[in-house]
Amino acid sequence: MTREVVVVSGVRTAIGTFGGSLKDVAPAELGALVVREALARAQVSGDDVGHVVFGNVIQTEPRDMYLGRVAAVNGGVTINAPALTVNRLCGSGLQAIVSAAQTILLGDTDVAIGGGAESMSRAPYLAPAARWGARMGDAGLVDMMLGALHDPFHRIHMGVTAENVAKEYDISRAQQDEAALESHRRASAAIKAGYFKDQIVPVVSKGRKGDVTFDTDEHVRHDATIDDMTKLRPVFVKENGTVTAGNASGLNDAAAAVVMMERAEAERRGLKPLARLVSYGHAGVDPKAMGIGPVPATKIALERAGLQVSDLDVIEANEAFAAQACAVTKALGLDPAKVNPNGSGISLGHPIGATGALITVKALHELNRVQGRYALVTMCIGGGQGIAAIFERI
């Protein structure tokens, strides 16, 4: 009998901006919070979970080496359930969901959790010479946050890869700025309409005047204008460059998690799933143009699902940069109205290891809100990869 994976709950935190409301909250704590809430919403006991997989990229403290396990146990999952932390860079959160789903498909368990947690605000500085080499004189530090934003093969910033994509796919500065502005418009409208309320679990922390509750995405510029965008100078290529701080994604902090179940088990429990996982796909591309990774990954996922682009109702294609987001939409022939209807990485933010899980939660809630059938979740990955997954509302 063929096994099917359904998502029975999905939650996320609000997304904090760099050095913002979540800068003092460890990613393991954010992970535990979303695990606990996802279990509660799914009406599933932590004793029933057979596997947990979490995405994380930048380790900020010793606990992060075991982030998946810490998030699981502190989130209420039985200590008997194994847990795994995965790093597929920007695709880590979605990879965690795929990997957790695979444990169900393989028959290892009937209940699994996939998610991601990241705190770019807490990224450490590495002192490579501190243990053995710093006997005399000055010693340098390596910014691990910036390290995650550089291509490991060509030692170039991801912004340069976006410039390469812009040139190859003829994406102008004006197109990028307009796309960035539209991202802020959509995110602002979604927040004001309350579209995210049901998917966000508040983060409560101690402040000098008592508890402080963080429950609203804070990276969005609600008053952004096209003039704001056009005034910014290119950051990565000074002469004839097009990528700016305004049309690139943010540096952010957040977490998200989904509870998945074998379909027959969900039916036995009388649960109403958000969606079923239809297919997924991975692909490798030239690292110098990593932003185009969603194109081949999406084609693989569509082929496995037996679907066409026209069948998709909601598309979450992460905006690492407006240049690559526009190129992906162009290359796949996507309907811009269906792509990131409530904003994406530029406006809401891109907490790298968590983003894949975040946009999955966003996609599933939006799919149910608009009563669509199919949703695509896809993203580019530093180092030259792409990942995609397709879900069906049932």
UniProtKB/Swiss-Prot annotation:
Pfam families: Thiolase_C, Thiolase_N. Keywords: Acyltransferase, Transferase. Gene3D superfamilies: 3.40.47.10. It comes from the Bacteria. The active site is at 90 (acyl-thioester intermediate), 350 (proton acceptor), 380 (proton acceptor). One of its GO terms (molecular function) is acetyl-CoA C-acetyltransferase activity. Its EC number is 2.3.1.16, 2.3.1.9. SUPFAM superfamilies: Thiolase-like (SSF53901). Disruption phenotype: Mutants are impaired in their ability to produce PHBV when grown on propionate. It catalyses: an acyl-CoA + acetyl-CoA = a 3-oxoacyl-CoA + CoA; 2 acetyl-CoA = acetoacetyl-CoA + CoA. NCBIfam families: AcCoA-C-Actrans, bketothiol_BktB, PRK09051.1. Required for efficient production of poly(beta-hydroxybutyrate-co-beta-hydroxyvalerate) (PHBV). Catalyzes the condensation of acetyl-CoA and propionyl-CoA to form beta-ketovaleryl-CoA, and the condensation of two acetyl-CoA molecules to form acetoacetyl-CoA. Belongs to the thiolase-like superfamily. Thiolase family. This is Beta-ketothiolase BktB. The gene is bktB.
